[in-house]
Amino acid sequence: MTTSRRKAREIVLQALYEQDLAGHNAEDVLKRLLTETPQTEENAEFIFRLTNAIVKHKDLLDENIRQFASAWPVEQLSYIDRNVLRLAIFEIIHENDVPIKVAINEAVELAKSFGGNSSARFINGVLSSVSKALADTAKQREE
């Protein structure tokens, strides 16, 4: 059974994917998707907030992807992998109420559901590197 937040992340991923692939406006895509798959008011707010923030910070998120997946140019990643990483990296860095392990697990599950055969392993590796770098940065701040 999928959790309501997992379903919300699936909708965010669908909107990001469609915007990335077809150039459609993410907010218009969300309105259509939420008509097709109604959500609670709380989830709808989460979906819009998360999607809009990811779209706004796409260039910074892509820089993070470049840093932690340096062997893979962002432009050459599959649309799914690229947008799962954008979503998860945003959550890891900016969503303080989402534990890092949860953000990584949710991203891996999205990759298993929507990505290719090696997507989940790739996503997990990149996000583990992001998590480790954040932990190292936090330790340096404490010292």
Curated annotation (Swiss-Prot):
<keyword id="KW-0889">Transcription antitermination</keyword>
<dbReference type="InterPro" id="IPR035926">
    <property type="entry name" value="NusB-like_sf"/>
</dbReference>
<dbReference type="GO" id="GO:0005829">
    <property type="term" value="C:cytosol"/>
</dbReference>
<dbReference type="Pfam" id="PF01029">
    <property type="entry name" value="NusB"/>
</dbReference>
<dbReference type="InterPro" id="IPR011605">
    <property type="entry name" value="NusB_fam"/>
</dbReference>
<keyword id="KW-0804">Transcription</keyword>
<keyword id="KW-0694">RNA-binding</keyword>
<dbReference type="InterPro" id="IPR006027">
    <property type="entry name" value="NusB_RsmB_TIM44"/>
</dbReference>
<dbReference type="GO" id="GO:0003723">
    <property type="term" value="F:RNA binding"/>
</dbReference>
<comment type="function">
    <text>Involved in transcription antitermination. Required for transcription of ribosomal RNA (rRNA) genes. Binds specifically to the boxA antiterminator sequence of the ribosomal RNA (rrn) operons.</text>
</comment>
<dbReference type="GO" id="GO:0031564">
    <property type="term" value="P:transcription antitermination"/>
</dbReference>
<keyword id="KW-0805">Transcription regulation</keyword>
<dbReference type="GO" id="GO:0006353">
    <property type="term" value="P:DNA-templated transcription termination"/>
</dbReference>
<comment type="similarity">
    <text>Belongs to the NusB family.</text>
</comment>
<protein>
    <recommendedName>
        <fullName>Transcription antitermination protein NusB</fullName>
    </recommendedName>
</protein>
